[in-house]
Amino acid sequence: MHPYLTGNIPGTGGIFKETPEDFLVTEIPIYTPCGEGEHIYAEIEKRGITTLEAIRRLAKALGIGERDVGYAGMKDAKGITRQTISLPRVAPEQVLGLELPGIKVLSAVPHRNKLKVGHLRGNRFRIRIGGVGADAATIAIAVLDILEKRGVPNFFGEQRYGAQGNSHLIGGAILRNDYRGAVDALIGEPDKVTDERWRRAIEAFKAGDLAKSLETFPPHCRTERELLQKLVKQPEAHEKAFRAVHPRLRKLYLSAFQADLFDRVVQQRMDSLDQVVHGDVAFKHDNGACFLVTDAAAEAPRAAAFEISATGPMFGCRMKEPEGETLAMERRLLETEDLTLPSFDLEGGLRMEGERRPLRVPIAEIGVEADGAGLFLEFSLPKGSYATTVLREVMKS
């Protein structure tokens, strides 16, 4: 469990995501489509499905390849999400005429280029917390005031780690070429799931009955089923079986491993989250550039003004390294995983170059509104940052 930046303030408690309407996220785009070109930028509202599942449904309905579909940010299945998807070689009328479960097309405008991951400014959130006390709004305002001044700890959200919270374990096994371990981690543990059929499928796998496991896995566990179909034929060919996993998912597992290591660094730096030290690689919030801190005292006013922040590692074979004690700490972390930076130079389109990620991010457009026994929070965060971190600080649960 991550520590709190606002641990001296009690939480509101309560629950959220009781209904999809309790969690609304809207992408903030960098640019709008120009009105001409072979790609259609479709703003969709999805409900109860992931971005990848939305892409599958759209691609199938339009007869295009999933890999040809572009998106700026990955969103999970919970709540309601409004985001833009790019679709090649189709007419706006085709897209606007779609009627698909879990997806509503809000607009469709042509553009010249495919939408790339990261092509968004951030996300705006409107979240309802239910079952809170009469002082919840006062508590939330106090917490958000500190987060506005010091920054939001840039932890990755739990959705980064998958339904069982094990995606980083799969990614770590891939990096160590431990494909038996990767398969075991992907199938997971029976006590991590609540679906009875899913639990029995995992237990059958653990008992070595691959055929029964394949037969028992629910249809929505598509990746597990595809992997087991290979293993049933060749039980010891773990690496070959793992190739059945969609390349996008393999990338997600590797990214989850990066995220786990980064989160550990944030935990270690929590008390000094709004400071920089000698040897840090600092991040400029106005343009995303990074530089090495050689005079921490001289840079302290810029950190206090939220112009710059210390960064942590998203490890990769070409990642810019810090110096001094910051470097020593990051290398110790890699050593605990029996890895070095060259370990991330993978083949098969899985090469991870790495980057620096700020340890904190600004929160903006803050709003708090009492709603009977509930509480509405509104705020925006930069791309790649998670609302769940803000909710943890507010709710302390």
Swiss-Prot record:
Entry EC no(s): 5.4.99.27
Active site: 76
Alphabetical keyword list: Isomerase, tRNA processing
Classification via SUPFAM superfamilies: Pseudouridine synthase
Ranges for domain TRUD: 151-361
Gene Ontology MF: a single term: tRNA pseudouridine(13) synthase activity
EC top class named in words: isomerase
Its biological purpose: Responsible for synthesis of pseudouridine from uracil-13 in transfer RNAs.
Protein name: tRNA pseudouridine synthase D
The species this protein was found in: Geotalea daltonii (strain DSM 22248 / JCM 15807 / FRC-32) (Geobacter daltonii)
